[in-house]
Amino acid sequence: MGQNGRLSAWYFWYFAFIGAFLPYFALYLQSIGLSAGRIAVLMSLGQFMRLLAPLLWSWLADSGGRRVRIVVASTAAALASFSVVFLTEDFVGLLIGMAILHFFWSASLPLVEALTLGHLAAHPERYGRIRLWGSVGFIVTVMGVGFLLDSAPIRSQLWVSWFLLLGTLLSALTLSEVKQTAGQMAGPILDVLRQRKVVFLLAAGLFMTAAHGALYVFYSIHLVAQGYGKSLVGVLWTLGVVAEIVVFLLMPRISLRISLRQILLACFALATLRFMLIGWAVESIGLLVFAQLLHGASFGAHHAATMAALNRWFVAGQQARAQALYGSVAYGAGGLCGALLAGALWESAGAAITFSAASALALAGLILVWRGVPGDSQGAPVR
């Protein structure tokens, strides 16, 4: 198997774990009697660790030039720390175990992303063909675990997740390093970070990820509480990822006709609609399906457009740090704030208000894009 195949396999296992863990772990926590607030805290630990951990791991990798070794070691540590879920149901014990898990788990993706782009150096347009297998892995497990949990105890989700983590570790062992050139490792980025468009793009990304906080923490709980089966919950999660894949495939064509600014504005507008539908139209399966298809815009198109903007605004030697910074600001700070806000609102105000708040966050991001992201990207393809 060539490096393309090994990278594709790694993405498959990595996102397969996320597909088994993210949508259903909150249901397990609910089953052991934890409050919505404590569930939100545990589910937001991933975002909390992404505040600073990616910057630390990327610095270590760049200074030592041993990305694969760090990926392997951190995945092994994540596997060991995840095992705490089999040993305790105590909140403090789970808090410590999940904190350690996410500290090490946060190392892998940015380093493998850099590894992939370095491997594809002359053909970055092929990135989607490799990254696509991550979405496939997510679909397989989110549907499979959903059907499994209709007949098996919720605790079985933990074992599935553990074995998928093991698969990720074994896959990481097959990866090989890509040599970096001096030009790829050089270059201060403060001058770029001070630019208005960069500040507004990062801030908008924070609000978009914060808006998704309610979705990632409480979407499954929300649907199960309305009487939907866990297999249907899995299908709805899968629809979102299918929409994401379709958008990834279509983005090069779309961006030849629509500017990056227009794409981002559409993403935030559709995200605003999506979260209102989830909160207020949960009894309509048709509207829920439509809302999940909008994941193609609220995540897929937004992610692709943001990556394209960073690729255009930062030179090659700044890309790794730019990606790590965006991950810390958007997925770290934004994800953490969104999850904690959702946890605070869920029990006190209810599901509809919680998802309305998510919609308001997306609307705030729309305003930031409108005010701060220039419309100068027409004709430059988003890869």
Name each region found by the language model.
Residues S156-L173, I353-R371:
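Symmetry-related core transmembrane helices of the 12-TM Major Facilitator Superfamily/SLC fold
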Residues L29-Q30, L60-A61, L132, F147-A152, ...:
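Interfacial helix-cap and linker-helix signal at transmembrane-aqueous boundaries
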Residues M98-W133:
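Cytoplasmic helix-loop-helix junction between adjacent transmembrane helices
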Residues R69-S83, W162, Q262-L277:
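Structural signature of the two symmetry-related core transmembrane helices
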Residues M1-R50, V198-G205, T209-L236:
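Helix-loop boundary and gating motifs at the non-cytosolic
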Residues M1, T174-F207:
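Juxtamembrane intracellular "pre-TM" segments in multi-pass secondary transporters
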Residues L52-R66, L149-D150, V246-L260, W346:
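Helix-to-loop junctions at the C-terminal end of transmembrane segments
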Residues F12, S81, F91-L109, L206, ...:
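Hydrophobic core of transmembrane alpha-helices in multi-pass small-molecule transporters
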